[in-house]
């Protein structure tokens, strides 16, 4: 039951980032970001359980973090498209990678770090949009 708190926190934080992407009609939105964040948390929590249950010198819990980063990299790569000289989806790929990191932070019970990272991610995703528009007027290819 103690795992319910990190799972709920992860769901909320992933949803916040996913909502921003959904409102911008980006390739990966609410469900994708929420599930990636939640899945990352679950993998870390499962590793914690495995170490407690089967612990030993050969069981390295940091390997799961490596696996999450690698797996999410493939998912993010699927959101990147190149079309007519423009590359689309890089920001969405980065946000997928970011929610995996947020979910991992929640999984290791670093809730403050996860919340601060979510706030900063939202500031970058939403706040930098006006900076990009100011720097490149008439160019809607950002994000």
Report the location of each language-model feature.
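Hydrophobic transmembrane alpha-helices of multi-pass small-molecule transporters
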Residues: 74, 99-100, 125-126
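Short, amphipathic, aromatic/basic-enriched membrane-interface segments that mark the entry/exit
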Residues: 61, 80-91
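Alpha-helical transmembrane segments and their membrane-interface boundaries
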Residues: 1-64, 107-116, 132-138, 142-143
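Hydrophobic transmembrane alpha-helices of secondary-active transporters
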Residues: 12-20, 71-78, 103
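Alpha-helical transmembrane segments and their membrane-interface exit regions
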Residues: 120-130
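Hydrophobic alpha-helical membrane segments
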Residues: 70-74, 91-96
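Ligand-binding beta-strand-loop-alpha-helix segment within the catalytic cores
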Residues: 48-49, 65-75
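Interfacial segments of multi-pass membrane proteins
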Residues: 21, 93-110
């Amino acid at each position: 039951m103690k795992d319910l708190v990190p799972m709920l926190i992860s769901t909320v934080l992933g949803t916040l980032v996913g909502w921003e992407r959904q409102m911008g009609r980006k390739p990966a939105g609410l469900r994708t970001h929420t599930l990636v964040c939640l899945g990352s948390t679950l993998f870390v929590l499962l590793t914690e359980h495995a170490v407690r249950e089967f612990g030993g010198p050969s069981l390295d819990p940091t390997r799961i973090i490596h696996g999450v980063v690698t797996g999410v990299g493939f998912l993010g790569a699927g959101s990147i498209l190149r079309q007519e000289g423009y590359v689309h989806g890089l920001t969405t790929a980065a946000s997928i990678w970011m929610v995996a990191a947020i979910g991992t932070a929640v999984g290791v019970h670093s809730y403050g770090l996860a919340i601060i990272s979510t706030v900063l991610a939202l500031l970058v995703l939403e706040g930098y949009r006006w900076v990009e528009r100011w720097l490149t007027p008439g160019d809607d290819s950002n994000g």
